[in-house]
Every structure is written in C-alpha cells, then in structure tokens.
From Swiss-Prot:
A GO molecular-function annotation: metal ion binding
Protein name as annotated: Large ribosomal subunit protein bL31
Pfam families with a match to the protein in the record: Ribosomal_L31
Residues the entry annotates as binding Zn(2+): C16, C18, C37, C40
Cofactor detail note: Binds 1 zinc ion per subunit.
HAMAP family the UniProt entry points to: Ribosomal_bL31_1
Domain of life: Bacteria
Cofactor: Zn(2+)
A single GO cellular-component term on record: ribonucleoprotein complex
Organism: Shewanella woodyi (strain ATCC 51908 / MS32)
Keywords: Metal-binding, Ribonucleoprotein, Ribosomal protein, RNA-binding, rRNA-binding, Zinc
Keyword Ribonucleoprotein (UniProt): yes
Family, as annotated: Belongs to the bacterial ribosomal protein bL31 family. Type A subfamily.
Amino acid sequence: MKPGIHPEYAEITATCTCGNVIKVNSTAGKSLHLDVCGACHPFYTGTQKIVDTGGRIDKFNKRFGALGKK
C-alpha cells in the first residue's frame, strides 16, 4: 500500500432517534445520526406490521396481466 493516500480511520458515535448510542469505526470523521437501529427497528424488536399489498398486486395485474398471455 502506498503511504499517505489512505483516509484516517477513527472511532465515531452513531446516535439513533431512540437515544441508543453506538460507537463505530469510520473514515467519515464525524458523528452520525440514525433514523433506526437494532434496538428500535421493528424486525429486531418483534413488532412487525403486515402490509396489505393485495390492492397493488390486483391493480398491476389488471393493467399488465394481458401482456403476459400469449
């Protein structure tokens, strides 16, 4: 590796909107603000909501369903 061309690698803090603070190593060099993290993301907390996409699928099939038939 060439000396002097690589960015500085430092420890920064990533702060989530839920208040969770995570220390990570990064070349960004400044603190990060996160919308969601592992402590508040619905997938990890088990509070998932099932989104009803049936209307979207029916609308798509109604518009483009005849194109797939030969």
